[in-house]
């Protein structure tokens, strides 16, 4: 998905841990996002099912994927998921507002916030604000986030033992000679 959506997807995943799968539960809680002006134009358009690229560029769909699937990786952008009635309804119901405070931060930081109504009709919100996404160079836990994404992307393709070898090589690349790495990559 578009790099500008990553902090929003991370925020949705955090809120999902607190409130559950809001797409499946469909309990009527409002979900809102604050975007810098540039992102309201780039990714804040109304969601309509379409191409994979359309889904990847849609802030609303990417956040929906974060709430429903806990990720916004290639498996979340299949034609079936992009046009799934629950996904479409949830994405279309997300409210987007321009947050001028974010204009001064983005794009130096890929920031953003998502909030969930704490109870249906309460008009009270629980906001998750992130200055940067989990994979950002500004995140002190970047390596952990990148390794988790690597494993998630390849879990159905490469056996866990081989993924662990690759991860170890990459995380220790500064301490390894090139010929050692080549030998290790002969999985």
Regions found by a protein language model. Give the residues of each.
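Terminal-appendage/accessory-domain detector
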Residues: 1-187
């Amino acid at each position: 998905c578009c790099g500008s959506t990553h902090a929003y997807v991370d925020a949705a995943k955090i809120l999902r841990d607190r409130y559950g799968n809001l797409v499946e539960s469909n309990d009527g809680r409002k979900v809102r996002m604050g975007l810098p002006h540039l992102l309201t134009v780039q990714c804040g358009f109304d969601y309509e099912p379409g191409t994979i690229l359309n889904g990847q560029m849609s802030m609303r769909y990417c956040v929906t994927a974060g709430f429903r699937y806990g990720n916004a990786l290639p498996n979340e952008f299949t034609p079936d998921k992009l046009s799934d009635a629950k996904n479409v309804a949830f994405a279309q119901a997300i409210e987007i507002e321009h947050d001028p405070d974010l204009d001064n931060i983005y794009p130096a930081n890929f920031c953003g916030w998502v909030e969930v109504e704490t109870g249906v009709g309460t008009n009270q919100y629980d906001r998750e604000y992130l200055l940067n996404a989990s994979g950002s160079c500004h995140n002190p836990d970047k390596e952990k986030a990148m390794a988790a994404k690597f494993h998630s992307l390849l879990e159905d393709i490469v056996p866990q033992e081989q993924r662990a070898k690759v991860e170890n090589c990459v995380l220790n690349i500064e301490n390894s000679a090139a010929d050692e790495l080549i030998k290790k990559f002969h999985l």
